[in-house]
Amino acid sequence: MAEDIEIDLDDLERRMKGAMDSLRAEFASLRTGRASASMVEPVQVEAYGQMTPINQVGTVNVPEPRMVTINVWDKGMVGKVEKAIRESGLGINPQTNGTIIMLPIPELNEERRRELTKVAAQYAEHARVAIRNVRRDGMDQIKKGKANGMPEDDQKFWETAVQELTDKSIGNVDQALEAKQAEIMQV
């Protein structure tokens, strides 16, 4: 029976990567004073009777470091896109020129930058907690294996493998946080 006990490291790694992917998405939603197409991804527009992502009603471009443009395909949708951006909470005032909506990204003041670094740190902590929860699940699998007759050497091997995977994943979170904080604080 002990031979059949196998810990699914691939599943644990996939779940830890999922936490990292979620962190990257949360980081992308933070406005850093630099224009990026991902800033407007969460914005939903009421189009043709249903809520639609903004990138499905127009082309999103970043022509300059502090400017996002949206070239709306349907002229009748321009007002709705503009309204959706204003109501999205991005804090950006859209400017319209025909079917092109320009979003000038204002520079962030020092206080706002510090607030954003704290928000980024909170997002990173949520990712660390998610990774630790996956680690706990892995350790629980090992305990079940031990109860079912897993040899002590195998138990130590799996515990080390799970811990190394956890350390690597948390290291990736820390690196991503440092990079995001540096990006936010850059003037």
Swiss-Prot record:
Task: Give the UniProt subcellular location, in the record's own words.
Answer: Cytoplasm
Q: Which residues cross the membrane?
A: none
Tell me the keywords, alphabetical order: Cytoplasm, Protein biosynthesis
May I have one GO cellular component term? cytosol
InterPro entries under this entry? Ribosome_recyc_fac, Ribosome_recyc_fac_dom, RRF_sf
Q: Name one GO molecular function term.
A: ribosomal large subunit binding
Per UniProt, what is one Pfam family of this protein? RRF
Q: Name one GO biological process term.
A: cytoplasmic translational termination
Cited function:
Responsible for the release of ribosomes from messenger RNA at the termination of protein biosynthesis. May increase the efficiency of translation by recycling ribosomes from one round of translation to another.
Q: Which family does it belong to?
A: Belongs to the RRF family.
User: By what name is this protein known?
Assistant: Ribosome-recycling factor
